[in-house]
Amino acid sequence: MTRPFDAIFADAAARKGGPAALDALLAETPSRPPSEIAATPDDRVLAEMARRIFNAGFSSKVIAAKWPAFESAFEGFDPHACAFMPDEKLEALLADPGIVRNGAKIKAVQANARMVVDLAAEQGSAAGVIARWPDADYVGLLELLKTRGSHLGGDSGMRVLRALGKPAFITTKDMVAALIRESVVAKAPSSKRDFAAVQDAFNGWSAQSGRDFTAISRTLALTVGA
């Protein structure tokens, strides 16, 4: 049976020096109000998607050092410019020594730019879609990113959302271990049924505690690891 969030928080607090110390750790990863997320320019949404995609499998320090070159090469991640890159532009990117020359990831930026452009045409802006999406259907937002975007499945989409300030759980090794301990899932979530169970658990813990998904996710992880 899943325990109440107060018990989970107490476990994490005991490992991290008490409730005040734990709250200070959680405050290091703040979420943003929906109005602030909605005001994010869509080029920054696309840039965050690109950053997370290129970080996967590479040193984050390497990507950070190269990031100004990425911004220049992808024209500031202007969604329209990236969505409709001609073949010669793609070829130039594949030959650009200033960035990571991974063809699949470069093409993923183009595919995600098209998604951002489409969402803006449908609902005003991609950032607005993310901001308005109800936390109670967080897994639905993950599914949108996975199915309409490229390379945004797994924890990549989760990390994009958290980086944008959306309350977000991330299925890290420690967080998954806590979910298994709490009998939410039997293994790392992979199926729709698994993610529905995680969503239900987070909805319940949020209702009990008044805390958002980012704080709950980090608290769970901190009952296991650093």
Segments predicted by a language model, with ranges:
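C-terminal accessory module of base-excision DNA glycosylases/AP lyases that mediates lesion recognition
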Residues: M1-R32, I130-A226
